[in-house]
Amino acid sequence: MVEKNFGHSCSWININSEEINNYSTIYQTYQIDKEMVEYALDENERAHIEYCRPKETLVVIYNVIKQMKRENRYETVPMTFIVRKDQIITISNRHNEYIVETMRKELEDRPNMSLFTFFFSSLMMITENYFPKIESLKKEQELVSLKLRHKTTKKNLFALSDLEIGSVYLVSATKQNSIVLEQLKTQALFKALEFAEEEKLENSLIEAKQLVEMTSINLQILQQLSGTYNNVLNNNLNDTMKLLTIISILLTIPNIVTGFFGMNITVPLTGLAHGWGIVLGIIVTVIVIASVVLLRFIKK
C-alpha cells in the first residue's frame, strides 16, 4: 500500500488488489463500496467512468498495457481510479504496479500539484507507456514481413497472426481510453477545473487520440499483410492443384495407348520386332503434345 500527501491537503492512496482479497477491511476503511471492488478485481473490466453525484465520487477504469508479452502479444489490464474532493485512490495489481512507481516519482518531482493535475498526469503516463510497445511491434512486424518474403512458413504465418490478434486488442483498449477522456470533458466537474488542469486533460486526450491512430494504422498494415499472404497461399495451392491435374491426365495416356494392344483385334506394329519401341515413341509424342496443349490452356 502507498499513502502520500501532496498539494494543498490532498492525498493519494494506492491499494493492491491482492490486499483487498486478503484484508476485506481495507475497502471499508477507505469507504470503497462493493461495486468498486468488483471493478478493481475484474481483469476483464472495460474502460469506463462513473460519477456518483451524492457522494461526489468519480470512478475511472483505465486500460494499462502489461509490461510483458503473453502468448507472443501484449495485453492490457484495467486500473481503477477513485477521485474525491481531496483524495485519489488507485487500485492496482501485479500487472500494472509499474505505473504506481511512475506516479510516485511524479509526486516526488512535483509535490505541489493539484489533485486533478496529478490524476490527468497519471492517465497521460499510462498512455505514454503504450508508445514504446507499439514501436516494438512495428519493428517485429517488419521483421516478420521480411521473413515471409524470403520464405512463407507456418512459424512466420503464426507470428503474423499473433501480431494481428494483439493489435486488435490494443486498438480496442486505446479506443476505450480515448472515449473515457472524452467523457471526462462532459462531466460537471470539468467546468470547475482550473486552466492548468483543463490543459492537462486536453493534452492527455491528444496523446490518447494519437495512440488510437497509431495502433489503428499498425492493425491495418498487419491485416493488409495477412490478406496478401493468404492470396499468395491460395494462388500457390491453385497452381499445385493445376499441376497435379496435368500429371494425372498425362499418366492416363500410356494406359490408353497400350490398352489397344490388349484387345482381340488386329493392331498395327504387333508383328514388328521393334514394335514396342515405336509404341513407346508414340506414347512419348502424345504426352509431349498433351503437355504443351494443357499448359497453354491453363495459362489462359
Where are the language model's segments positioned?
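Hydrophobic alpha-helical transmembrane segments and their immediately adjacent juxtamembrane loops
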Residues: Q28, K209-K300
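Peripheral, non-transmembrane regulatory/ligand-interaction domains of membrane transport proteins
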Residues: M1-T186, A192-L193, N203, Q210, ...
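Hydrophobic helical segment of the DHp/HisKA dimerization and phosphotransfer domain
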Residues: Q141, S178-L181, K185-A188, L222, ...
